[in-house]
Amino acid sequence: MKRLFAFVVLFLTLLAGPALAQQCLHGTNESAEQAARKRDALTATRTINNIQANQPGAAKGQYFRQEELAGAPFAARLRESPSETVRRISLNPGTDILPNWKLTLDVTRTGYWFMIKDTSDPCGFAYISNQAGVIFQGEPIR
């Protein structure tokens, strides 16, 4: 009886395993819609770096905090952009930078770093960058 019970538990575990596996939105099986969302988020990532690099304080290593981005001179021109993606970017505190993409920005004495994370992706895909302007893509180790 113990052997049968162990077999049933093992069998059910093997059946449930794939059902419990996370379906990542970005990766080898990424849909065209998710790839487009990811491109839009990359545009937003580049936009944050441009706002930070093209403001007067950048030469002295002074950068905008997240709550200051919406008031940046470069940010004021986003709504006039020919790019629909750029026009959809929201820099208002407490809002998604793009639908289901969250901006986290931290300014230090010597620079800044930020992450734009896909909040709809169970695997946590994100773009990460800093004052050097290099953009990384990442997700948590699984």
Where do the protein language model's features map onto the residues?
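Bacterial N-terminal signal peptides
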Residues: 6-16
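Positively charged n-region of N-terminal signal peptides that target proteins for export
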Residues: 1-4
